[in-house]
Amino acid sequence: MLKFLNSFSAPLIGSLSFWPFLCILLTIPFIISRLIMRRRVTWSYVFFSYGSILYFTGLIFFTLSPVPKDPIAFCQTYHIQPQLIPFNWVNYVVHPDKDTLYITLQLVMNIVFFVPLGIFMKAYFHKHWKFALLSGFLLSMLIEVTQLTGVFGLYPCSYRLFDVNDLITNTFGCLLGFML
């Protein structure tokens, strides 16, 4: 379990380190757009905006890092194949082994990571639950395709696993957040 939790330390530090710079960079455009749309800026809007920036920064760092130090050597050594079988994690529940805890935690964290997106969709856009469902699925698909393509060709191979179950759990997490 500690190994699983340790895998979050570098992305967490990266996102928290990068967040203040993004806030400074995006504050003026956010305030200008808010003034144009609503003609006022409230503290709750500022707090919500900074929280959203932190969420999306964290999402990027958690889903795309760590990156391989030597991409060419990584690609020659590892051949990551997409996991395209929906609900294959059920086998680990029915027949537990040494990976069951890790896989369970990964599924739970995928749901947890997308709950804030659903909350954001409901609070900011005031749309129907179908909007949250579609948004969660599309953002999750963007992340998975980014992982599958090695950040759209920046890396010579896929260095993260494309997993169809991530699409399912992330979309569910977004919908759950919308329902809260």
State each model region's role.
Residues 159-172:
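Individual transmembrane alpha-helices with interfacial aromatic-anchor signatures
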Residues 1-159, 175-180:
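Bulky hydrophobic segments
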